[in-house]
Amino acid sequence: MSKRYAVVSIGTNSTRSLLADVAVENPRVEAARSIGTRIGEGLGESGRLGDEPMQRTLDAIAQLARAIRGHYVRLFVVATSALRRAENAEEFAERVRTLLGVPLRVLTGEEEATASYRGALTAFGALRGERVGVLDTGGGSTEYAAGSTLRPDNVVSCEIGAVRLTEGVPDLAGRDGAVPAEAVARAREIAREALKPLAEQEAVERLAFVGGTATTAGYILKGQRTPVLSYPLTREDLQRTLDRLLQAKLDDRKRIVGLKPQRADILPAGIIILD
């Protein structure tokens, strides 16, 4: 018997929906969609969610909810880094409740890391039995979890993401042309400092990347726009992709096959964090 659950997830850069049948042994994803909403735009400077980012996120939530309405037995709405930090998070949460009739749950960094880890291991069942690390680079934070079963034994959340790093080093966006070497060096130093907790982690047999930065790098390397699942990425792959982005101005980045235009300004920051 089918038992479909739906989730709407509000990230710093994107809002996503997922519909899955959880009645089977291995949950089966039946529909998934992502819309670039960037609710975290300007949050680092003001400490608040802006009116325009909130409204476009609410519009996206309504659009995603319409597409899956009637196909699930229960709907969950969650949010991550931007809502953890925003002074007016409760105001936005109330607007979501009014829109959907469902409470918004703001995940802690540790809960987010655990969810990314379990999702990755469920999708890539062949990884089970090894000690695996899962690194999820988002728009506002970066999560890491490791373990050898579906329950991670170590989770870390770091306060850095692709949107936050780009806003901290605006030249990374490429609006004025190629990114200066000084800006890249500054971004690497910021990332290195924020990610210090990861340097202390126990070695793993395999490291899996999840999130928009890693999947977009895979799209670009394969030269395609269709979904990439379980695509191997080496440090050389990441560096080659980063070099290409850093040398291109923003308008030219938007024409790269596999790169969604709304992610063109923040992808270099995301790759710097991954690397």
Give the ranges of each region predicted by the language model:
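N-terminal basic/disordered segments at the start of proteins
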Residues: M1-R28
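Helical "lid/coupling" subdomains associated with nucleotide-phosphate turnover
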Residues: K3-Y5, L19-V22, R38, G42-H71, ...
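Acidic active-site catalytic centers that drive phospho-/nucleotidyl reactions
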Residues: S9-G11, E112, D136
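Short flexible coil/turn linkers enriched for glycine and charged/polar residues
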Residues: G11-N13, H71, T98, G138-G140
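Structural motif
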Residues: S14-R16, S141, A214
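Short amphipathic
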Residues: A31-I35
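A generic, well-ordered mixed alpha/beta core segment in the N-terminal half of proteins
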Residues: G133-S141, A145
